[in-house]
A protein has these predicted regions:
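Conserved lysine of the Walker
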Residues: 13-14
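Walker A (P-loop) ATP-phosphate-binding motif of ABC ATPase nucleotide-binding domains
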Residues: 2
């Protein structure tokens, strides 16, 4: 089963995903934690849920100082492509060990366009394991269509993160 946590930008999708995981600490996965500089988004760190390891994921171009060995770019953000390779390796282990559910935050335009977690999400969907993913509300249908997710439960988040 795929559970999609959805809401508008800053509605609390990541907070809801973290609360869902922390209720019983079953499964494993990753949450994208927003890093602020005053009122501006500095970037995002990736939190590995089972061990609380934090790894830089994206840095806004305004603050980027060649922080990553291998980079990609999405909008105004530089991506840590080494992190993606590491995430894929960890997800492969979770699939092999049949760890469930697996959490992934956040799936969106980058993945629809073949980047970010695209390959990771394809593997997860093929695995048959339970998934919990965060998706912005205006992207639920495009994500479900692109990844051929037909059966899913929606968790609507109304608040602000």
């Amino acid at each position: 089963m795929v559970k999609i946590i959805t809401g508008k930008v800053n509605a609390g999708k990541t907070t809801t995903l973290l609360k869902t995981y922390r209720l019983d600490r079953k499964g494993d996965g990753f949450a994208a934690i927003k890093k602020m500089n005053g009122n501006e988004v500095y970037g995002y760190n990736m939190l590995h849920l089972s061990n609380d390891n934090i790894i830089p994921w994206m840095v806004h171009q305004k603050y980027y100082q060649r922080d990553f060995t291998k980079t990609g770019k999405f909008g105004p953000f530089y991506l840590n492509l080494d992190l993606l390779a590491m995430l894929e390796s960890i997800i492969d282990e979770l699939i092999a060990q049949r760890i469930s559910p697996i959490y992934l935050d956040e799936v969106g335009v980058l993945e629809i366009n073949g980047g970010g977690y695209h390959n990771i999400l394809k593997k997860l969907l093929s695995s048959g394991l339970d998934l919990v993913i965060a998706v912005r509300d205006d992207l639920v249908k495009p994500v479900a269509s692109h990844f051929d997710i037909k059966d899913y439960e929606l968790v609507q988040v109304q608040g602000e993160e």
